Structure formats: structure tokens, C-alpha cells
Regions:
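Conserved glycine(s) of the Walker
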Residues: 13
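Conserved GTP-binding G-domain of TRAFAC-class P-loop NTPases and closely related GTPase folds
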Residues: 120-251
Length: 252
């Protein structure tokens, strides 16, 4: 009943940050990009989307739709199992996150957000180095949209359920992004403030109480003796069946 939303521009290092912070808590990572990359490789297509022909663009769009379908099936199964999840997205569309967060909360989930912040310059450089490259005319507007949503996300999730990770390289310190100390701090915040805290969502609490009630109805088998006087077990007879048996006995 815990869901962590990731937000950050393409190439900001969200997946890396998630693996180093939330991953150790057993959260399942929901990311259509993983399925997309797998299907692209299966189709023998390059992940460098800066050099695609119109025909390749069309094929890529079909594969993208298939990846989304696969991820939706995965999400449904994990939600049915009430499993903790990391929703790995860019956060470019505020309305999409707003709707998705509401869906999870309607299912009983507590929600949290990790916002991975980077400078535009470092985002462009990382995009050049990674296998799945995005065109800059898509990358730059996406980065700007995410930055514009920062304040909205902070207000939506609240200070207690929102954390910012600065993953911008520091030339003076010689770091390529968030330091091990930064990641340790985020790990501690997630552990203390979210992953292990008691569930707050009333819907989840009600579901848990219902499950407890179902379990309490199941009585232990009765200890009886067989025809030879030896101890044996038989399933407990439900109350409604006992009443019927009593009526049958009196009717004879």
C-alpha cells in the first residue's frame, strides 16, 4: 500500500536514483521505458531516436504502444497484490500525475514523490551518453515542463511526502551527480518517513481490518474421537449448519 512517484526530465538519472534509494525496500518499479527498450531490441531497432527515418518513427510508435499495454498489465497485477511500487515517469504532465496519484489513493495507497533535479546542460550531456537518446527538440521542452511543475508537485504531495534530489554534476567537487552521502540521506528519509511508517490511507486500513475479520472466522478443527476412541480432527461445523442440523433433529 505504498507508491513512490518519480519526476525528472529525460536523462536526469531517475532510474539510478530509484535503484539506490527505494529499490532496497522491495518496491516494484513500474516503467514502460524498460518494456519499450526490450521490444525495440527484439525488433532489431536502434535506441538512438535522434537518427530515425519516418518509417522507423512509425514502427517505434507501434512498439511504444505495445510497451504501455505490457506495463498496464504489470501494474494491474501489482495493485491487486497491494505491492509497493515506484512509478518511474518524467512528470512532464502535471494532470497525468494528479490523476494517477488519485487512482492509487482510491486503491488504498499512501503516496510519495522523489523529484530528481538537474540543470539543462547536464541533462543534454547525459542524453548524449546514454543508449536511448532523445532529440533535443523533445528533450529541452520536456525538461522545462518538468521544472515548471516542481512547485505544483510540492504542493500536491506536501512537504512530508516530497523530497528533491539534486543530481547535477558539481565540477568544483568533482562529482557526477548525487553523492553517496546524498543517496544515503534520501534512503534514510524514505525509510523513516514513508516505507516503514504505519499506513495512513483509510481505504487500506479498512481493507486490512476486513481481512483480519475473514481470518478470525476460520476456526481451528475440532478435536473429537473416532469410533475406536482415538483422537482425530474434523473441520468445525459453521453456525448456520449447526442450526439446520438442530431443526432436522427436532423434526424427527
Amino acid at each position: 500500500f505504498k507508491a513512490i512517484f518519480l519526476a525528472g526530465g529525460p536523462g536526469s538519472g531517475k532510474s539510478y536514483i530509484a535503484s539506490k534509494t527505494a529499490g532496497g525496500h522491495g518496491f516494484k518499479v513500474l516503467n514502460s521505458d524498460k518494456a519499450f527498450e526490450y521490444l525495440m531490441k527484439q525488433a532489431g531497432m536502434s535506441l538512438d531516436m535522434t537518427k530515425m527515418s519516418p518509417e522507423e518513427e512509425a514502427a517505434k510508435d507501434v512498439i511504444r504502444d505495445r510497451a504501455k499495454e505490457m506495463t498496464a498489465v504489470q501494474k494491474k497485477a501489482w495493485c491487486q497484490g497491494k505491492l509497493g511500487q515506484v512509478i518511474d515517469g518524467t512528470g512532464r504532465r502535471y494532470d497525468k500525475i494528479l490523476k494517477l496519484r488519485k487512482q492509487y489513493e482510491e486503491m488504498g495507497y499512501d503516496t510519495y514523490m522523489i523529484f530528481v533535479n538537474t540543470s539543462l546542460e547536464s541533462t543534454i550531456e547525459w542524453n548524449k551518453k546514454r543508449e536511448r537518446k532523445v532529440k533535443e527538440d523533445i528533450l529541452i521542452p520536456a525538461w522545462q515542463d518538468v521544472q515548471n511543475n516542481l512547485g505544483k508537485f510540492q504542493q500536491l504531495f506536501g512537504n512530508k511526502d516530497f523530497v528533491i534530489v539534486d543530481n547535477t554534476p558539481d565540477i568544483e567537487k568533482g562529482t557526477e551527480g548525487a553523492t553517496p552521502q546524498d543517496l544515503d540521506a534520501i534512503w534514510n528519509v524514505i525509510t523513516k518517513d514513508f516505507a516503514v511508517r504505519p499506513i495512513r490511507n483509510p481505504k487500506a486500513k479498512a481493507w486490512i481490518e476486513t481481512e483480519k475479520g475473514v481470518c478470525s472466522i476460520e476456526r481451528a478443527p475440532e478435536r473429537v474421537t473416532d469410533q475406536y476412541g482415538s483422537p482425530s480432527e474434523r473441520p468445525a461445523i459453521p453456525g448456520w449448519r449447526q442450526a439446520e442440523m438442530e431443526k432436522e433433529r427436532k423434526g424427527k
